[in-house]
Amino acid sequence: MHMPPHLPASPPLSWPQRLEALLKDLTNFPWKSTARTLRERYSEDRLGLTASSLTFTTTMALVPLVTVALAIFTAFPMFAKLQSVLQKWLVTSLIPDNIARQVLGYLTQFAGQASKLGGAGIALLLVTAVALILTIDHTLNGIWRVRTRRSLGQRVLVYWAALTLGPLVLGVSLSITSYAISASKGVVGVMPGGVQFLLDVLQFFMVAWGMAAMYHFVPNTWVKWSHAWAGGMFVSAGLELAKKLLALYLGKVPTYSVLYGAFATVPILLIWIYVAWIIVLLGAVIAAYLPSLTSGIQHRGRSHGLQFQLALETLQQLERVRSDAVKGLTMQQLAQLLRVDALQLEPVLETLSELDWIGLLNEEFKGEAARYVMLANPDATALAPLLDTLLLRREESTQNLWEKGRWPLLNVRDVL
């Protein structure tokens, strides 16, 4: 039997070729669409208001979280030496240098005082820490448009694992780095610039990894690691830039130091926490909307009747393929046909499913996604339930519009 010749494997790319490919990808990336999406989501999701809420909750939860971390290191004496390393790294990498030392001192002092609290006080601290965790969970699931949340037990289990294992993993990696630095200083006296650069890069990627892990695991939906990493890299770069700008501003314009004196650390810390949360939420938007951005699908701005319009367009597409050999369309196919982001389309599909107008067809074929199919008979199904749900509720004040517009007499076929 004649066998087709094997095609030679493509040679591995050299570093210059990889760099050229990366630059090409960065050049072709939809930067303008990304900026527009960030602006729209910031306004529509009220991320500024959400960041304010998270700033307050974070301020209240800082001491409880540090107390939990200290308790973990106390429970494992073998990791006691990692405690100071981790504390210093977290503060210096996430907080501007101008206030890092004061914040570290305050947190250590307050966390030490927490051990003197009674059972009720400790319980209150834990409730405050859990409140921050649940607020983050609610916010990120809202950005991903997730309707079905994990059970409280699952959320507590996931976040408790993060609170216990996270500090230990970070502490081990940082202690190794600290040991390498100490050893190198003992040999060469002064840390070379190249070593400092590598440490800065390590710090950058550790922050990016932490954010990527949060974007991947927290939303109760499937998030690709590549998308989570894109959001994490944005956050890490944004935090570094924000720290530099805030440090430059505080150095040039010492307004807070003049007004508040030694108390200036508090308002500066609040401003920084707010800015940091804005960056983290924008990173979540990038991770959530990256599939649509890279595929060229535009996010439709919020407008009156948009969900009703998307529902009609969805019904039109499903009716069009009703008699095809392959029944129905997947969510991604619908998003492509309607030129809309899948995150915007998902609540519309849920509404149509609740009305029993469409259904989700799951067939056990390898590599084939579930498809939405038309269930309603357009000629015998009244349009009123959809109008009432997505466009205008039928109430006493709108009764005349409903009657004179003859909306109760319309059926689905009339709008297809």
UniProtKB/Swiss-Prot annotation:
Keywords: Cell inner membrane, Cell membrane, Membrane, Transmembrane, Transmembrane helix. It is a multi-pass membrane protein. Pfam families: Virul_fac_BrkB (PF03631). The chain crosses the membrane at residues 60-80, 117-137, 156-176, 187-207, 222-242, 268-288. Its main location: membrane. Signal peptide: none annotated. PANTHER family: INNER MEMBRANE PROTEIN YHJD, UPF0761 MEMBRANE PROTEIN YIHY. NCBIfam families: yihY_not_rbn. This is UPF0761 membrane protein Rfer_2991.
